[in-house]
């Protein structure tokens, strides 16, 4: 890029992609504020973006992205805010809706969607797309969304489903130990139950695993049947909207004890537009 003549700083960009989050964070620690050919360089995480399915174009190929985020430090950046729905774009007469109803409709139109690409054994099983109820449990939904994108430096990438019980659920999210005894949230190790408004009403429900009241971390489960006995004990925060067949494939390698016959891995994850 051209030199900034106000500050007389030379500006340029370089991007390095790492397979493991830990390797990327170590590289940042080692290289940030280091000196190359007499010039100090700044190294941080490229701002994560929401992607469309099948879209693999690197963020730095977008000129607008470079102008907006290339020279800004990671700290202090705001995450993407949901689009505001223009009432004129809806088919309903907005004059017939109360303010509360309008807010509810806008929130529902802007619910975040995230995805898991699942690998079972050595083969790709497919993609699961999940919709998060940020309108009802915003803290819980944001925790899951951020762990899907990995924007905090840790998350679900390469995490396993360590416990799968047919006709019950598939549990995962322990990216610390991988056996159901670890995990952490974006708010610290644990956070409180937000509310129990949503119910375990059937196949595809997303809910937080816990070890008692107010012990939510990163572990979660996907219901494969109605689990109403869990209502009031586990916080429901979303549902599977696509890839139900992939969940069934995962369920098929489970057992009554929960031990999986083949490894079930989240090979890739993120947020969809």
Swiss-Prot record:
> Region Disordered: which residues?
77-103
Q: Where is the RRM domain?
A: 1-48
On the tree of life, the source organism's domain of life is Eukaryota
Record comment: activity regulation? Binds cyclosporin A (CsA). CsA mediates some of its effects via an inhibitory action on PPIase.
Keyword Transferase: yes or no?
A: no
Keyword Isomerase recorded: yes
One GO term of the cellular component aspect?
mitochondrion
Sorted UniProt keywords: Cytoplasm, Isomerase, RNA-binding, Rotamase
According to the UniProt entry, its GO molecular function terms are: cyclosporin A binding; peptidyl-prolyl cis-trans isomerase activity; RNA binding
Q: Which reaction is the catalytic activity of this chain?
A: [protein]-peptidylproline (omega=180) = [protein]-peptidylproline (omega=0)
The alphabetized list of GO BP terms reads:
protein folding
Function in brief: PPIases accelerate the folding of proteins. It catalyzes the cis-trans isomerization of proline imidic peptide bonds in oligopeptides.
The text of the family note is: Belongs to the cyclophilin-type PPIase family. PPIase E subfamily.
What name does this protein carry?
Answer: Peptidyl-prolyl cis-trans isomerase E
Identify the species of origin.
Schistosoma mansoni (Blood fluke)
